[in-house]
Amino acid sequence: MLVLASASPRRREILSRFIRDFHVVPSNAEERCSGTPEECAVELARLKAREVYSRVGGTVIGADTVVSIDGRVLGKPSDEGEAYRMLKLLSGRVHRVTTGYCIIHEGKEIAGSATTEVKFRELDDELIWAYIRTGEPMDKAGAYGIQGKAGLFVEWIRGDYYNVVGFPMEIIWKLRELGFEVLSR
């Protein structure tokens, strides 16, 4: 039994493109971390995977995505003001999106991370506030979702697009190496 330890509809949708049969069991793990953005993302993914594995067993995938700039991790905004400050900070600059993952398979942990660089165009206040009013940034690390309206903000990316959405293809390849059938219908 393959289990996705996430409530994210984006992760569920990406995984379903490649693997047909899996269950979704959101994690109840407390999200706390320290260290570099990469260490933080992997630590949070481990916490999620371990918590769900302790309840349901099977093969469990935990993932967590962080946005960082100047070594500072940007989580999900707590309110519109914080969303504005995050988007203003990202405006016209390159930032990093890192997804940590942990797969628990047959009691063993396989953990890693993928990082993608993203450059935003210069964003004026009118555009930032128009985006915030859509409600889209409020449940996303760094206050944006590349797969939605914020795709307009992106000048370029270097790396895995799906990583920026929150589920890098590296996870699919790891599952394939573990014997899970991909691309079957």
From Swiss-Prot:
Keywords: Cytoplasm, Hydrolase, Nucleotide metabolism
CDD domains: Maf
A single BP term in Gene Ontology: nucleotide metabolic process
Pfam family, one: Maf
Enzyme Commission code(s) on record: 3.6.1.9
Catalytic activity: dTTP + H2O = dTMP + diphosphate + H(+); UTP + H2O = UMP + diphosphate + H(+)
NCBIfam families per UniProt: maf
Protein name per its UniProtKB record: dTTP/UTP pyrophosphatase
Organism expressing this protein natively: Thermococcus gammatolerans (strain DSM 15229 / JCM 11827 / EJ3)
Organism taxonomic ancestry: Archaea, Methanobacteriati, Methanobacteriota, Thermococci, Thermococcales
